[in-house]
C-alpha cells in the first residue's frame, strides 16, 4: 500500500470501500488500525463518481490527490506535487505517469531452468512500459495549459484525476466542480474541464509520479461503443464552453472537433 510509504507524511488517507464484498474491506480495516492517518469509509456500491464526490466532501486537507485501487504511487509523488504547488502558488499540478501492461502469456510460459526465481521471471516480463507526459516542466497560465490540452484532447494525461494535485478550497467553493454521477465513462475528464474553469495557475512536472496498470478487463476497456460516443458528445460541449470562455474557441475549433475521433495513449 504505497500511499502509506510516501516521503510526505502529513497525510490524511481516505480509503473508500464502494460496496466490495471480497477481502478488500478486512484488509483496509487492518490498515486503518495500524495507521492513524487512514480514514476508512465503508459504503453501499454507488459507482466511482459518487465515491469520489463523497471522498472530496470528507477530505480535510489543503490539497486533493487520487489513487485508483489497482495502481501505485512513486514514494516521492505527494511530496513533489505539494512542493511545486506551494512554491508556485499553483491551483493545479500535473505530472507524467507510467503505463504498465502486465505480461499475461496465452499459454504456459517457458522459463529459464538455470534461473532459480521463476516468479520473478514472470513478473518482470512486461508487454509494455511507457512514460507519458505532454507538457514541458514549469509554470503556465490557464491559456497556456488550455493550448497544451488541445494538442492531446483525448489523452489520459489530461483526462484522468490520478496524475494531478488539486486545491481543496477551490473544489469546495464551486458546487459544479465534482464528478458527474450521470456519466459512466470519462467522468474524470468532466471533473477536470470544470475545475480548469476556476483554476488560474498551473504547473507541470516531467517526472512520472504514478504507475497506471492497464488491465484489459478494466472498465476503460469494457466500455460499450455507444456509451463512449454518448459521453464524448456530451463532453464536447464542455470543451466548447471552456474555450469560448477563454476566448480561444475559434483558433482551436478544429482541435476540439478532433476530440470526437481521437484515441487516448492507452
Give the ranges of each region predicted by the language model:
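Donor-binding/catalytic cores of nucleotide-activated saccharide
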Residues: 72-203, 210-227
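Active-site acidic Asp-centered loop
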Residues: 18, 67-69, 94-96
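Short, acidic, metal-binding catalytic loop of nucleotide-sugar glycosyltransferases
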Residues: 1-10
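Glycine-rich, basic loop-to-helix element that forms the pyrophosphate-binding segment
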Residues: 43-59
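A conserved acidic beta->alpha catalytic loop
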Residues: 17-26, 46-47
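C-terminal subregions of glycosyltransferases and related glycan-biosynthesis enzymes
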Residues: 204, 208-266
